[in-house]
C-alpha cells in the first residue's frame, strides 16, 4: 500500500494491486486494495481488490474471476456461516458508511476547490486586488485632472503674484504722487511767503511814494507862497513910500526851503537805501534757505526713493515666498489626503485578506481534522480487513495471489516497496507573493510475504 500527498493533484481514489490513497490540499480521498488467495473473491474499498472499480462494495474477481463476494456470502452452506456471516455483514455495512463518507468528502473537496478557484479569480494577482469595483480605467482621467489642477494652481499663483506686483507698483506711484504733491505744496507755500514779502515791500514803496508826493506838494505850496510874497514885496517897493524900520533881519526862505528840500531828499534816499538793503538781506537769506531746503529735499527724496525701491523689492520677494509657501502647503495637504486615503484603502484590503486567510485556515484545519479522522478510520478498516482475511485464511487454510482465473497453484513471493513523496506547501497572498513554504516528506514501505501485505507509513 502507498500513501501519496500532493499539493497539485485533486483526484480522488486510485486503483492498483497494492491500493493507494491520494489526498489534495482541498479535500481528502481514500482508496485501498488488497488481494485474497481465494480465487473469484474480491472486494474494493474505493478500489476493487485486484480490480479497477472505485465504487466500492463486493464484486469483481481477480484477473477476471467470475466468483463474486455476494455469491460467496449469499451461500448459506459456503465457507462462512454463523458469526462469520454477521461479521461480514457488519464489515459490509461499515464499508458502505465509509464509502458514503468518502463521497461526501469528495463533494466537499470539489466545493472547496470551486470556492478557492473563485476566490483566486476574484482576489488573485490578476484581479482587482480585493476591490469590489475596478477603478483602473479612471486612473488616467484622475491623473489628467490632477495635472490640470496643478497647472491651474500654478497659473493662479502667477496671477496672484502679478496682481501683487501691480498693487505694489500702484502703491509706489501713489507714494510718488503724494511726495510730489507735498513738494508742490511746500513750493507753493514758499512762493506765498515770498509774495507776502513782495506785498510788504510794495506797501513800503507806496508809502514812501506817498510821502514823496506829500513833500513835493508841500514844497510846491511853499514855492508858491514864496513867489506871492516876492511879488507882494516887489509891488510894495515900487511906490515912493520910504518906510524905515529898525527891525531884526528877516529869514531867508529860499535857503530854508533849499535846506528843507535837501533834508527831505537825504531822508528819502536814506529810507530807500535802508529798504533796499533790508530787501536784499532778506532776499539773500531767503534764497540761501530755499537753496539749503532744496538740497535737503533732494537728498531726502533720493533716499526715500531708494528706500521705496528696497521696500518694493522686499515686498515682492515676501509675496513670492508666501505664494510658494501656500502652494507647497496645498501640495502637502493634497499629498497627505491622498496617502491617507490610499493607506485606509490598503488597511481595508489587509483586513479583508486577513479575514479571508483566517477563514481559509479555519477550513483547512477542519479538513485536516477530517483527514485525520478518515486516516484513523482507514487504519481501523485495514485492521478489520486483516481480520477478515485471517477469517478467510482460517476457513480456507491459505492465501495466494493469482494473475488469472484458473492459473497455477499457490505461490509464495516476498516483495517490498518503498515510496517517498515530498510535498511542498506554499502560502501565497493575492498578489502572487510567497508568504511561507514548508516541505513534508512521506516515506511508505510495503512488504509482501506469502501474498500478505504489510504497510508502514512514516513521515
From Swiss-Prot:
Record SUPFAM superfamilies: Intermediate filament protein, coiled coil region, Myosin rod fragments
Location relative to the cell: Cytoplasm
Region: Head, residue numbers: 1-83
UniProt region (Coil 1A), positions on chain: 84-119
Record keywords, A-Z: Coiled coil, Cytoplasm, Intermediate filament, Keratin
Residue segments, region Disordered: 436-459
Region Coil 2, annotated ranges: 257-395
Principal subcellular localisation of the protein: cytoplasm
Region (Coil 1B), start-end ranges: 142-233
Protein name: Keratin, type I cytoskeletal 27
GO-annotated cellular components: cytoskeleton; cytosol; extracellular exosome; intermediate filament
Note: There are two types of cytoskeletal and microfibrillar keratin: I (acidic; 40-55 kDa) and II (neutral to basic; 56-70 kDa).
Subunit record text: Heterotetramer of two type I and two type II keratins. Interacts with KRT6A to form filaments.
Tissue spec. comment: Strongly expressed in skin and scalp. In the hair follicle, expressed in Henle layer, Huxley layer and in the inner root sheath cuticle of the hair follicle. Expression extends from the bulb region up to the point of differentiation into the three layers. Also present in the medulla of beard hair (at protein level).
Region annotation (Tail) ranges: 396-459
InterPro entries: IF_rod_dom, Keratin_I
Domain IF rod span(s) in chain numbering: 84-399
GO MF annotations in UniProt: structural molecule activity
Amino acid at each position: 500500500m502507498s500513501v501519496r500527498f500532493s499539493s497539485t493533484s485533486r483526484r480522488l481514489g486510485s486503483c492498483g494491486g497494492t491500493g493507494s490513497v491520494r489526498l489534495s490540499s482541498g479535500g481528502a480521498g481514500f482508496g485501498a486494495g488488497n488481494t485474497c488467495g481465494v480465487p473469484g473473491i474480491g472486494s474494493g474499498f474505493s478500489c476493487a481488490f485486484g480490480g479497477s472499480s472505485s465504487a466500492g462494495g463486493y464484486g469483481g474477481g481477480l484477473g477476471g474471476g467470475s466468483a463474486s463476494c455476494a455469491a460467496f456470502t449469499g451461500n448459506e452452506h459456503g465457507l462462512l456461516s454463523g458469526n462469520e456471516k454477521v461479521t461480514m455483514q457488519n464489515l459490509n455495512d461499515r464499508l458502505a458508511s465509509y464509502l458514503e463518507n468518502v463521497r461526501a468528502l469528495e463533494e466537499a473537496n470539489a466545493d472547496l476547490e470551486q470556492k478557492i478557484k473563485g476566490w483566486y479569480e476574484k482576489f488573485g494577482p490578476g484581479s482587482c486586488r480585493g476591490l469590489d469595483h475596478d477603478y483602473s480605467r479612471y486612473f488616467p482621467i484622475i491623473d489628467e485632472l490632477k495635472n490640470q489642477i496643478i497647472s491651474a494652481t500654478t497659473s493662479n499663483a502667477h496671477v496672484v503674484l502679478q496682481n501683487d506686483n501691480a498693487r505694489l507698483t500702484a502703491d509706489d506711484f501713489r507714494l510718488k504722487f503724494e511726495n510730489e504733491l507735498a513738494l508742490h505744496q511746500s513750493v507753493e507755500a514758499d512762493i506765498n511767503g515770498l509774495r507776502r514779502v513782495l506785498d510788504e515791500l510794495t506797501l513800503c514803496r507806496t508809502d514812501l511814494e506817498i510821502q514823496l508826493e506829500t513833500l513835493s506838494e508841500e514844497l510846491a505850496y511853499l514855492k508858491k507862497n514864496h513867489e506871492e510874497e516876492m511879488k507882494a514885496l516887489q509891488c510894495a517897493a515900487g511906490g515912493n513910500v520910504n518906510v524905515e524900520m529898525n527891525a531884526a533881519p528877516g529869514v531867508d526862505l529860499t535857503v530854508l526851503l533849499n535846506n528843507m528840500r535837501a533834508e527831505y531828499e537825504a531822508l528819502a534816499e536814506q529810507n530807500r537805501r535802508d529798504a533796499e538793503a533790508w530787501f536784499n538781506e532778506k532776499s539773500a537769506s531767503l534764497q540761501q534757505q530755499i537753496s539749503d531746503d532744496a538740497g535737503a529735499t533732494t537728498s531726502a527724496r533720493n533716499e526715500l526713493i531708494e528706500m521705496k525701491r528696497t521696500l518694493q523689492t522686499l515686498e515682492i520677494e515676501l509675496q513670492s515666498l508666501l505664494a510658494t509657501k501656500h502652494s507647497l502647503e496645498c501640495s502637502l495637504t493634497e499629498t497627505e489626503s491622498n496617502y491617507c486615503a490610499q493607506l485606509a484603502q490598503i488597511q481595508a484590503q489587509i483586513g479583508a485578506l486577513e479575514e479571508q486567510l483566517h477563514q481559509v485556515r479555519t477550513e483547512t484545519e477542519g479538513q485536516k481534522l477530517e483527514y485525520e479522522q478518515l486516516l484513523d478510520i482507514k487504519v481501523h478498516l485495514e485492521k478489520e480487513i486483516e481480520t477478515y482475511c485471517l477469517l478467510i485464511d482460517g476457513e480456507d487454510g491459505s492465501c495466494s495471489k493469482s494473475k488469472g482465473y484458473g492459473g497455477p497453484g499457490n505461490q509464495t513471493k516476498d516483495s517490498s516497496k518503498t515510496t517517498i513523496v515530498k510535498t511542498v506547501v506554499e502560502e501565497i497572498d493575492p498578489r502572487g507573493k510567497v508568504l511561507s513554504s514548508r516541505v513534508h516528506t512521506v516515506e511508505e514501505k510495503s512488504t509482501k510475504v506469502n501474498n500478505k501485505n504489510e504497510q508502514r507509513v512514516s513521515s
